[in-house]
């Protein structure tokens, strides 16, 4: 594309082959012949004096190829970022970035954050890509987003983690469901923390087996020797779990951050529709919340300022 900061064609072809693990698919994407792709790889291997791919029986990156892939991928991200910044200047745009975040946390975090951020940076354009942390990690490595709000993000040498806070799981249960299983005198006692063993007969909505939150809940239940005997529903969407709880159908275990909207619900609803929120005793599996960006890309002032505002607003919300 005209105006791009160009990367050597050999490296572009190498990236395609490394990602497709197929000369024919790489050729199709590059609109060249398979022989042309082969020639580019051969020239690059000769230049570096090493094999970048092995074929036994399928094409794979060698150790040298993996090192080169990481380096060239970062070069591509830096190149694209520089091109984007230059275009913004020439087009008169003050700046833009793309952030990854989960749907549930976007609803809780963004209204307050963007209200304050807009006061200082009214001309910055922000796009939001909504998905789970594992997907957002890949999008960042591929250069498709600039940063993301991660929950227990994996440790990767290309990631820079900016710690925000630790979130903890809380039990939520409607007043109507609570009264079916507990006496009024239990309410005051539970406000300081509940033992999940006392809720073994209460119906719960739980998370999918593959979900990260399901894993830490299972670890706690296993360690404490607890079994929930009534789990009619499984869904990883916390918003749905909260709505089922509000309806009095099931209880749920959700991060404290995502239960914050229930406080507003409790202030506005009738007393019989209140939802109780309890901390869980001995639940030693915090959710580490970070803002994550690519270590190799220098962040402009307006993104660093966004980090600071997110941190300040989260601390206000959680206290």
State where each predicted segment sits.
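Beta-alpha-beta core module
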Residues: 156-163, 167, 197, 239-296
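A short LG(V/I)-centered, amphipathic sequence patch enriched
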Residues: 45-63
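Secondary-structure junction motif
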Residues: 179-181, 187-224, 256, 299-308, ...
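Short helix-boundary/capping micro-motifs
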Residues: 15-32, 58
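Alpha-helical linker/hinge and terminal dimerization helices associated
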Residues: 11, 47-48, 68-90, 306
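Hydrophobic hinge/microswitch elements
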Residues: 132, 141-144, 151, 212-275
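N-terminal winged-helix
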Residues: 9, 34-35, 84, 90-121, ...
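Short beta-strand-centered segments that line the small-molecule binding cleft or hinge
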Residues: 113-116, 133-183, 265-266, 276
């Amino acid at each position: 594309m005209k105006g791009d900061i160009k990367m050597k064609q050999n490296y572009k072809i190498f990236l395609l082959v490394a990602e497709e693990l197929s000369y024919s698919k790489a050729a199709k994407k590059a609109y060249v012949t398979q022989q042309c792709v082969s020639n580019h790889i051969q020239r690059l291997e000769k230049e570096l004096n090493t094999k970048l791919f092995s074929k036994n029986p399928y094409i794979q990156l060698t150790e040298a190829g993996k090192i080169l892939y990481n380096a060239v991928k970062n070069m591509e991200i830096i190149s694209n970022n520089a091109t984007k910044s230059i275009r913004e200047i020439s087009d008169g745009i003050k700046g833009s970035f793309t952030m990854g975040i989960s749907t549930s946390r976007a609803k809780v975090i963004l209204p307050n954050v963007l209200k304050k951020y807009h006061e200082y940076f009214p001309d910055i354009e922000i796009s939001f890509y909504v998905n789970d942390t594992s997907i957002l990690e890949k999008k960042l490595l591929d250069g498709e987003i600039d940063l993301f709000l991660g929950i227990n993000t994996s440790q990767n040498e290309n990631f820079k983690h900016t710690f925000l806070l630790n979130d903890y799981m809380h039990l939520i249960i409607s007043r109507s469901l609570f009264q079916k299983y507990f006496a009024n005198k239990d309410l005051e006692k539970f406000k300081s923390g509940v033992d999940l063993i006392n809720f073994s007969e209460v119906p719960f909505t739980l998370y999918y087996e593959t979900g990260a939150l399901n894993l830490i809940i299972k670890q706690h239940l296993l360690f404490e020797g607890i079994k929930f005997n009534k789990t009619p529903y499984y869904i990883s969407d916390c918003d749905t779990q909260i709505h089922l709880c509000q309806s009095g159908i099931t209880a749920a275990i959700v991060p404290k951050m995502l239960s914050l909207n229930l406080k507003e619900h409790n202030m506005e609803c009738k007393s019989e529709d209140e939802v109780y929120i309890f901390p869980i005793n001995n639940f030693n599996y915090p959710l580490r919340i970070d803002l994550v960006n690519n270590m190799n890309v220098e962040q402009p002032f307006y993104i660093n300022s966004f980090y600071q505002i997110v941190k300040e607003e989260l601390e206000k919300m959680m206290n």
